[in-house]
Amino acid sequence: DIVLTQSPASLAVSLGQRATISCRASESVDNYGISFMNWFQQKPGQPPKLLIYAASNQGSGVPARFSGSGSGTDFSLNIHPMEEDDTAMYFCQQSKEVPWTFGGGTKLEIK
């Protein structure tokens, strides 16, 4: 299975500043010229919401302050400017190989 290592495990960012979350895969998640890396946001009591798919594409209705980048094994999610509503857990997920696997999560809070 592809192992995803997320960092940091927790992060506190001031309103209006930038939050950066990293995800490293144990092997490349690229195939057919596509990076099969996705990012999800989850709030307590709610299902995960897709923010970014294929490394850098925004999900439907996702604000422009969420952006993703990377290829191969190294990826990042950026949130800028940080808003109060962005407090949540964030997860990377690879969809290159079954079983699809998730990172351990990053808890994002307001500083």
Curated annotation (Swiss-Prot):
| Disulfide-bond pairs as recorded | 23-92
Q: Where is this region: Framework-1?
A: 1-23
Region (Framework-4) residue spans? 102-111
Q: Which UniProt keywords apply?
A: Adaptive immunity, Disulfide bond, Immunity, Immunoglobulin
Against SMART domains, the record matches this protein to: IG (SM00409), IGv (SM00406)
Q: Where is region (Complementarity-determining-3) located? A: 93-101
Q: Region (Framework-3): which ranges? A: 61-92
A GO cellular component annotation here is:
immunoglobulin complex
| Region: Complementarity-determining-2, residue numbers | 54-60
Family matches, as InterPro entries:
Ig-like_dom, Ig-like_dom_sf, Ig-like_fold, Ig_sub, Ig_V-set, IgV_Light_Chain
- Cross-referenced Pfam families, in alphabetical order? V-set (PF07686)
Q: State the residue spans of region: Complementarity-determining-1.
A: 24-38
Looking up PANTHER family in the UniProt record yields:
IMMUNOGLOBULIN LIGHT CHAIN (PTHR23267)
Miscellaneous notes:
The PC 2880 and PC 1229 sequences are identical.
Official protein name in the record: Ig kappa chain V-III region PC 2880/PC 1229
Query: Organism classification, top ranks?
Result: Eukaryota, Metazoa, Chordata, Craniata, Vertebrata
